[in-house]
Amino acid sequence: MSERTYSQVNTGISVREASFVSPSQFEQLLASPSSESREGLLQGTPYALDSHEIKDLSALEARLMTALLAEYQWAFEVSPQSDLVSLFTLKYTYHNLKVYLKHKATERKLGHLLIPIGPYSLDVLEHLVATFSAEHCPAFMAEEVAATWQEFQDYQDLRVLEIGMDLAYFKHLRYLGDSLDHPILKQLVDVTIDFYNAITVKRALDQQKPHSFMHQLLSDEGSLSAHQVIDLLESGQWLTWFYQVNPLEYDLALETYEEKMRTGQLKTVELEYLESLVKFSLLD
């Protein structure tokens, strides 16, 4: 992925970024005293709403989703490598597979939960779940869906569908990261999986769950194995864990989180914030 290949795309991104809500605009929105003033602040952005729509959560969600769909559609259209965009949309693909699997298991109408973002259409994903056929997607996707469905048949527990697709997502994410063969993208995949594992272990420890519970939820696709993550975090070695998974050089913004790790006071929500911070800094 050379700079020359993406130079035109980067220009297009710069133009589109100019229409986004800026940090200062966002702060103004938070401090805005009325729907009318928020309407004015949103004019000229992809999220323009009138004062009545702003009060309607359904209308607000629909507008945000429309804007999100438009951005990803544009990204797929202009990117010289669609897999690069897929790296960021894959979470929607596996969310949709969960929805279709749950529909298959319960026969409940869940279509309102589908998010039509990603390289595979909803029709392709629905067909995949119905037939376990790999006609329009990689064979390993069909294998993971079929294996997850078989496990559900054995245990009759909907949580199996959630866990199976989460772990399949991380395997697919690792595959994409390796195939794109760019150090920053490989680090991004590591960070995504490493933080998922850590957040999962943190919640499990807070709830005093056993090792067996943790192991069934964790992925071995990160930079540390599930066993290593459990051993480190169960013994309170949060800082050791972070030093091993953090791809960034020294950053003053991380000090607060590191101190809380050192004193054992880091909360789950702070760990989630830290993941976002590391990813943002990595891609900046």
Cite the ranges covered by each PLM segment.
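Extended alpha-helical surfaces
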Residues: M1-D284
